[in-house]
UniProtKB/Swiss-Prot annotation:
Domain of life: Eukaryota
Biased composition (Low complexity): 148-157
Region of interest: Disordered: 128-159
GO cellular component, one term: BORC complex
A family per Pfam: KxDL
Protein name: KxDL motif-containing protein CG10681
GO biological process, one term: lysosome localization
Family, per entry: Belongs to the KXD1 family.
Organism: Drosophila melanogaster (Fruit fly)
Amino acid sequence: MSHLGLADVHQSEDATPDLESFTGFGNSAAEAFIQSLAGMVNQGDVETMIRAQKQMLQRFEKTNEMLLNCNALSQSRLKSASEDFKRHVKCLSEMKKDLDYIFRKIRIIKQKLQSQFPAIYAEVQPQRSSLAEEAEDDTEAQAKKTAETPAPAAAKPVLSTKKSAATIEYVQMEEAVDNGTVEIENELIKRVCSVETANPNDSSDCTSEDTG
């Protein structure tokens, strides 16, 4: 009976393997699964993927650095452009004020001339359009002639009938306003002021502000 009992014990031990023999090397089931899975993966492919990821990371870092530099440059350029724009807007507003002042003075002078010399003003008024057209035609002819010939050609003078001193001053004033010549305009304003000063019936004065 003792021999049979020992034989049964040996058979039971042989039929049930231990944990170490099942998993191998005394590792747990999870570790054994991971090792088996790692053995199925090619290590060369894994290293290639890691290198590709590192290269892409470096490219992304360089791209981010370039974008940061571009943003900084754009901000500096925008700041300088904004300052220039504000300065130009301020300059244009000042120029508009000056032009408003000049045209207001011109209207005042025209009203004075109309009140002092109504007959001459009515006679000269229809000639404004013809004088402007003649000046425009002369300008176009001069530009065309200059384009055709290399040598500069002298412009033809505009002939006008001299009615009186006040009429001449008025016609020259209109030409100066049309051409936008500031120096001639100031000189003509001085002449008109001298004509007004010579007239004893006119109580208005002409200061240096009129020529400003």
